[in-house]
């Protein structure tokens, strides 16, 4: 199955003490084992690195560890989806026309990458946020791990 992972799924999969680790880790492991075909947005690489290195409460990891987690778990097994300049502009124009603002802008860009990947499942911890940005047909493909 083709699966797209939001950044928050990757972060949860990498950190054993994350509250969603036990549901997120199998998603990444299935991709690494070749059981599923995995996709992530290019933006998620930088976002995962930033989150991993700045987690509150002493839970952050060293920059070299963050890079190792991304390199070994994502770059070796997942296809990286990039939006073209035209796709980026179209997505932002649609967001503006629909009144999408603030942090939801990143959700709409990640969702556009998920759609571009052709994934049958779009995994996110923000199911409601993603589902509120799209039509009924796509909503059925958006789920938590």
Regions of interest found by a model, annotated:
Residues 79-125:
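Active-site neighborhoods of divalent-metal-dependent phosphate/nucleic-acid chemistry enzymes
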Residues 45, 58-75, 79:
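Glycine/small-residue-rich phosphate/adenosyl-binding loop
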Residues 2, 108-145:
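Acidic, PIN/NYN-like endoribonuclease modules and their adjacent C-terminal/linker elements
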Residues 39-42, 124:
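Short beta-strand segments at enzyme active-site cores
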Residues 1-40, 55-68, 132:
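Short, well-structured N-terminal submotif of metal-dependent ribonuclease cores
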Residues 13, 31-34, 51, 55, ...:
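Alpha-helix C-capping/helix-to-loop hinge sites
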Residues 8-9, 43, 109, 128:
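Alpha-helix/helix-capping structural signal
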